[in-house]
């Protein structure tokens, strides 16, 4: 299966700016044990027997679900105002048996007018994950102006710092959800203006 702008637009609901695709990435999927274990298997595991990093995953399931819910709320805000076609990878509904998750993320970023990596504080620090790293490695040089990394002010990560230096990545912080939404709206608006002026190529 080939992931294209047309495929993405076709699978998303309609908004004012259907052709302005804003891909939202977050840490929820990489750390969600539902992808690996059944409910029965999770119930049988004694959390105290697990090594530290895995113990964190089990203890913070609610926070991981909240991270996904946060992305959904942000998506709704951006689709309402300014009306851009904000989406999560799950919305395009491409089976990972057909295209693996990392390749999907790279292609969604390549097809999108804007991409944001959103990293809330989950009670501990994780890296940005394999998908984000692969996206940056593949597309930072050609799509760097369309990428932003926004993390909650409590998040400290060596990978974020190195990504900023290595790929000249735009990094923003936020303290409240309202501030996060405002920054993403400004980012989308800035890209729209640059496309209209011809500073950035139009993708259609």
Role assignments for model-derived ranges:
Residues 1-204:
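Conserved catalytic or regulatory cores that recognize and/or transform ribose-phosphate-containing ligands
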């Amino acid at each position: 299966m080939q992931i294209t702008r047309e495929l993405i637009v076709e699978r998303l609901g309609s908004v004012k700016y259907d052709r302005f695709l804003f891909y939202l990435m977050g840490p929820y999927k990489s750390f969600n044990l539902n992808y690996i274990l059944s409910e029965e298997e999770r119930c049988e595991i004694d959390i105290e027997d697990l090594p530290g990093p895995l113990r964190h995953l089990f203890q913070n399931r609610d926070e991981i679900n909240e991270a996904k819910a946060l992305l959904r709320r942000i998506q709704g805000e951006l689709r309402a105002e300014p009306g851009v076609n904000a989406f999560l990878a799950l919305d395009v509904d491409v089976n990972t048996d057909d295209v693996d998750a990392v390749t999907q993320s790279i292609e969604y970023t390549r097809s999108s007018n804007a991409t944001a990596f959103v990293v809330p504080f989950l009670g501990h620090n994780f890296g940005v994950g394999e998908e984000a790293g692969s996206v940056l490695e593949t597309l930072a040089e050609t799509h760097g102006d369309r990428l932003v990394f926004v993390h909650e002010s409590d998040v400290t990560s060596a990978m974020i710092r190195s990504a900023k230096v290595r790929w000249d990545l735009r990094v923003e912080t936020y303290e409240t959800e309202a501030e996060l939404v405002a920054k993403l709206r400004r980012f989308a608006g800035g890209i729209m203006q640059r496309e209209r002026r011809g500073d950035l190529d139009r993708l259609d």
